[in-house]
From Swiss-Prot:
The entry's keywords: Cell cycle, Cell division, Cell membrane, Cell shape, Cell wall biogenesis/degradation, Magnesium, Membrane, Metal-binding, Peptidoglycan synthesis, Transferase, Transmembrane, Transmembrane helix
Cystine pairings recorded for this chain: none
Protein name (record): Phospho-N-acetylmuramoyl-pentapeptide-transferase
Pathway(s) the chain acts in: Cell wall biogenesis; peptidoglycan biosynthesis
């Protein structure tokens, strides 16, 4: 543990954290008025919480802020193109591009219909297969089983399972991004968990990237926390999902996302349960899905929701350390 703390206090690590944070803080006041001027505003669903309707027109695609911040930070740190940290950066960019295209089309069409489902699926499959192949050839097909102190070799099933894993993780983070600051806050904690594990297990570059992205998200939160001046959009949420999935994959810990990313999982399950129940019985289990909207309908404020979900994530990350 002492060595891990030393790594966290390493000048390079601290520089990555501070640079990511500083770049986001600087870019926020540049991007927000620029996106306003371009009329890149969020279209709010009329079937969502009524309190959200006043947010219509809030600049979206804010993921570009931490997207650029962490990219510049990693370039300044001067990692080689084949380093693990850069592989995570590539995945952030790849899935961020999908989100960017989705956001742009939503803005052009002035509705919530961006990329068609099949178009998004094709792009997700292409990037997921490429990353799964990278994992198969460079990382190995074994993954750590939580609480068991053992590994499971996926063998020939590795690539198809990893492709499904990427689709699930990116969409789960996307669903979590439904209220001001929620996805950002939860993901900062998850990234910190993986950064510590990265340093502890010798994956220094992954640890540095995780810290840099956490710093960039903290800077972004200055503008994304309630009341949000900017939304991350699919540009941000899909990029974050792709990055987290790759970080966990390199650490051989994809199963740990079920634990430390428990909020992502619950958000996704709430949608699946709601849709399944309505289609089979005509009844809804929740007042609204994803589940953060259910709690909003129950009278919870966005600030309370973000605080409670963040505390839960912190507890889940502690459980994650126990599961190692």
């Amino acid at each position: 543990m002492g060595d891990t703390i030393k790594e966290l206090l390493n000048p390079t690590v601290l520089s990555a954290l501070l640079m990511g944070f500083a770049f986001s803080m600087v870019l926020g006041p540049i991007f927000i008025p620029m996106l306003h001027k371009l009329k890149f505003g969020q279209n709010i669903r009329t079937d969502g919480p009524k309190s959200h309707l006043k947010k219509s027109g809030t600049p979206t695609m804010g993921g570009l802020i931490f997207f650029i911040s962490v990219s510049v930070t990693m370039l300044i740190i001067e990692y080689k193109p084949t380093d693990e940290g850069m592989i995570v950066l590539y995945s952030l960019i790849a899935f961020g591009i999908i989100g960017f295209l989705d956001d742009i089309l939503k803005i052009i069409h002035r509705d919530n219909l961006g990329l068609r489902a099949y178009q998004k699926m094709i792009l997700l499959l292409l990037f997921s297969i490429a990353l799964a192949y990278y994992g198969y050839t460079n990382i190995g097909t074994d993954i750590i089983i939580p609480f068991m102190n053992s590994k499971l070799n996926l063998g020939i099933f590795y690539i198809p399972l990893v492709v499904v894993y990427y689709a699930a993780t990116t969409n789960a983070v996307n669903l979590t991004d439904g209220i001001d600051g929620l996805a950002s806050s939860v993901t900062v904690i998850v990234l910190t968990f993986f950064a510590i594990v990265g340093f502890k297990t010798g994956h220094y570059q992954v640890g540095v990237f995780s810290i840099a992205l956490a710093g960039a998200l903290l800077g972004f939160l200055r503008y994304n926390a309630f009341p949000a001046k900017i939304f991350m959009g699919d540009t941000g949420s899909l990029a974050l999902g792709g990055a987290i999935a790759t970080i966990a994959l390199i650490l051989k810990m994809p199963l740990f996302i079920i634990i430390v990313g428990g909020i992502y999982v619950v958000e996704t399950l709430s949608v699946i349960i709601q849709v399944t129940s309505f289609k089979t019985t005509g009844k809804r289990v929740f007042k609204m899905a994803p589940i953060h909207h259910h709690f909003e309908q129950c009278g919870w404020s966005e600030v309370k929701l973000v605080t409670v979900f963040s505390i839960i994530t912190l507890i889940l990350c502690i459980i994650g350390f126990i599961a190692l």
